[in-house]
A protein has these predicted regions:
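Long, compositionally biased terminal regions
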Residues: 1-757
Length: 757
């Protein structure tokens, strides 16, 4: 960094450390406290590293002494802790290898053991088998060295070793062995069978349910016996009038059993209440067994308790009482969720643990007859929804299938799964099968690398910067087939994102994948990331101007341009992108000024005013359509009206969440995102379709609660006004209509619409 660059302070890490300390010291759940203690250690590392100069947060190389290609351990907000992610204790397979070879239990010894003839032969066998599991990209470095040596690329292999050997003591450079090869890249899953099995195995009994079962199976029958015993003393309805032969010995037995039940069944406490029915009858029984006569007050309490119990449930043994107890017994006999969770976990134990579940329905089938008795449940009982929801997270299928099933429920979840497909596409350019599998694993592991907090227009480390990836670059073949495959994957992912989640901004990880695929397909398309308002540097890279120009070619004079008052021809005329002396990233002063001018901001940058930064960033998103125009450039057939209606559904849902929301600004911002995407899709439809949509929006709004109608009516009115040919004034108003934006430096008009109840 230069002296002119902005640096990150310790305020945020200190705040996170304080929160973690509070949770670790006060939370009632032990597992939560343990997780908080881990966060405390990591945030303490961040604070200490920043204070001591070991960390340079905001840089691509935030950890002193570690090159950019090392995967750093990163905590919330993109802060590096100072530790490498591929470090830590030896894995079990590493420990086994050290013991087998008689080596010291340290990584340096293991590192050099792989470079012996025997070690290289093992690596070669591992490469050919494809049976390994890569968690961090560093773990493919030595397998690449083995491949290079086998391919006769000795100098390239030595070059990789020169880069990684200085870190042999801290990092692991080999993958963990696995029982299985990598599966079909087209099949994805959110979690593995092993992941959900462990979750189900940890499912504990529900305390409330268990308490209810104890009441139904233990204390209700005891209460019936107690009531029956007292009813035997009635004469003409008066309790305690007679004492039959054998009554007192049976009373002694019942009280002894009460002591036993109390010791064995501790969940219920109602029976201990001396003023409750059981408490009154039991206390009176103890008095009689002790040889004392009941006082008039005690006799009256017993009489009242017996009469109340008989009125409520009837005489024990009567048809109505028997029917009630039989119904309660059936309720108590219902399998509990934790029992069924354990049963399903046992089914999952027989499946491959490192991949998803191909046939979820079979795993979730009703209880088999041979499973019922060992599990203590009823044969034919269906799997409860809470258990099914956990298992479904491991469902394996194509992206489209998982979106349709609701397994992938957000664009963020989609973004987490796309590296598998993108990795296979990138690896397809390597003809050698072993190297292709290894490259696929490297790419997927690299995409799981957490993003760093970066300042001064720095970009995240790219996979091509890894020394071992550079070393095999010459083995890559760029053909029309590989380019076509990259384009197909690009179109597929973009289509899945925009059609699956039309009201959501593309998450930055997905934007990165689409950008990489575009380059592999030889398509020069501008993909822009969502910028963080709290670290915005006041300028945009040149690709934002390129994206705005691309949007203008499609949207000039459209509903979108008229709604947001965009002069796309003027944007097309901007041509001032250039490289700056203090950074490598190209920028456009004219585009920066345009974004600030559109919100009436001064020329002075507002690095430390989040709201002021947010309104400027939002204008860049408006001008560029935040990747929607770029997606349309791919020629994807977008069902525009259908997508616009789905956006409207999201807008209504988000508007409803504003009501009584103590922190509504994030919801308002997401609402504006959905509204903007709706406008883009509407702009792709005909004028007749737009008019019909305006009527549709008003009709949908009319069915909403008062607080939703009041908050959203200005936006719907403003939309109809622009569709009919009108314009907003300089303040974004048109009569009672308003232009809907997400960011503001004053109170947002949606937050004070009038009625609050």
């Amino acid at each position: 960094m230069s002296d002119n660059d902005i640096r990150v302070g310790v305020g945020f890490p200190l705040g996170q450390l304080a929160c973690a300390l509070t949770t670790a010291g006060t939370h009632e759940d032990e597992a939560t406290r343990q997780r908080a203690e881990l966060r405390v250690r990591r945030w303490q590392q961040v604070v200490d590293g920043m204070a001591g100069g070991g960390l340079d947060i905001g840089s691509r190389t935030p950890v002193r002494g570690l090159p950019a290609w090392v995967t750093p351990e990163v905590v919330h907000g993109g802060f590096a802790t100072g530790e490498p992610a591929a470090g830590g204790p030896l894995r079990p397979d590493e420990t086994d290898r050290a013991q087998r070879l008689g080596l010291p239990a340290d990584r340096r010894a293991l590192f050099w053991s792989w470079l012996t003839d025997a070690g290289l032969e093992e690596l070669g066998e591992l490469l050919d088998s494809g049976r390994y599991r890569v968690k961090y990209a560093e773990e493919t470095a030595l397998p690449v060295v083995a491949w290079l040596l086998r391919a006769g690329e000795r100098d390239a292999a030595l070059g990789v070793l020169d880069e990684i050997a200085p870190f042999a003591e801290r990092l692991r450079f080999t993958p963990a062995p696995s029982d299985q090869r990598a599966g079909d890249p087209d099949v994805v899953y959110r979690q593995t069978a092993g992941d959900v099995r462990r979750i189900l195995e940890q499912r504990q009994p529900n305390a409330q349910i268990e308490t209810m079962r104890e009441a139904l199976t233990v204390w209700n029958p005891f209460a019936d016996e107690l009531l029956t015993l007292w009813c035997e003393t009635r004469d003409g309805g008066r309790i305690g009038a007679v004492t039959l032969d054998g009554w007192l010995p049976r009373a002694v037995q019942l009280l002894a059993r009460y002591q036993q039940l109390t010791a064995e069944h501790t969940l219920c406490s109602k029976h201990r209440n001396p003023k409750g029915s059981i408490g009154v009858l039991r206390t009176a029984l103890e008095r009689r067994v002790a040889g004392a006569e009941l006082t008039p007050r005690e006799r009256g309490l017993v009489q009242s308790a017996v009469d109340a119990m008989l009125r409520k449930r009837g005489q024990p043994g009567s048809p109505e009482h028997t029917a009630l107890r039989e119904q309660q017994a059936r309720e108590a006999a219902r399998p509990r969720h934790h029992q069924l969770a354990q049963l399903v976990a046992a089914r999952l134990a027989g499946l491959p643990q490192d991949i998803g579940i191909g046939d979820v329905d079979h795993v979730l089938r009703p209880v088999d007859a041979d499973e019922a008795h060992p599990a203590g449940v009823v044969a034919g009982w269906p799997t409860p929804r809470p258990v099914a929801r956990v298992v479904t997270r491991a469902a394996a299928g194509t992206l489209e299938q998982l979106i349709d099933r609701g397994v992938i429920a957000s664009a963020e979840e989609l973004a987490r799964l796309t590296p598998r497909l993108a990795a296979a596409t990138a690896a397809s350019a390597y003809p050698d099968p072993a190297l292709r599998i290894l490259t696929d694993a490297t790419y997927r592991a690299f995409r799981n690398r957490r993003s760093l907090l970066l300042l001064n227009l720095e970009h995240q480390v790219r996979v091509a910067e890894l020394p071992w990836v550079q070393a095999v670059a010459s083995a890559r073949t760029d053909t029309s087939d590989t380019r076509n495959q990259a384009r197909r994957t690009l179109v597929r992912l973009a289509s899945a994102a925009v059609c699956g989640f039309p009201a959501t901004l593309l998450p930055n990880p997905l934007v990165g994948e689409l950008s990489t695929l575009s380059k592999q397909a030889s398509l020069q398309l501008p993909w822009v990331e969502e910028l963080a308002a709290d670290i915005f540097m006041g300028t945009f890279s040149a690709k934002f101007l390129q994206a705005a120009k691309l949007a203008g070619r499609r949207l000039a004079d459209s509903l979108y341009a008229r709604y947001y008052d965009i002069d796309y021809p003027a944007i097309a005329a901007i041509d001032d992108t250039s490289r700056r002396l203090i950074r490598r990233t190209r920028t456009s002063d004219a585009f920066d000024h345009l974004c600030r001018d559109r919100v009436g901001a001064s020329g002075k940058r507002s690095w430390f005013n989040v709201a002021a930064n947010g309104v400027i960033i939002e204008q860049a998103q408006i001008l560029t359509t935040h990747n929607l125009a770029t997606i349309a450039e791919l020629g994807i057939d977008l069902p525009s009206t259908y997508l616009a209606k789905r956006c409207m559904d999201t807008v209504l849902r988000l508007t409803a969440r504003i009501h009584h929301n103590p922190r509504p600004l994030g919801t308002v911002k997401n609402n504006a995102h959905a509204w903007r995407q709706m406008l883009f899709f509407l702009s792709l439809s005909s004028w007749e379709g737009q008019e019909a949509f305006a009527a549709y929006a008003e009709k949908r709004l009319a069915t909403q609660p008062d607080h939703v109608r009041t908050r959203l009516a200005p936006a719907v009115t403003g939309l109809a006004h622009v569709i009919s040919g009108g314009k907003f004034d300089a303040d974004g108003r048109a009569g009672t209509g308003r232009r809907l934006l997400g960011w503001t430096t004053t109170e947002h008009w949606m937050l004070d619409p009038g009625p609050r109840d």
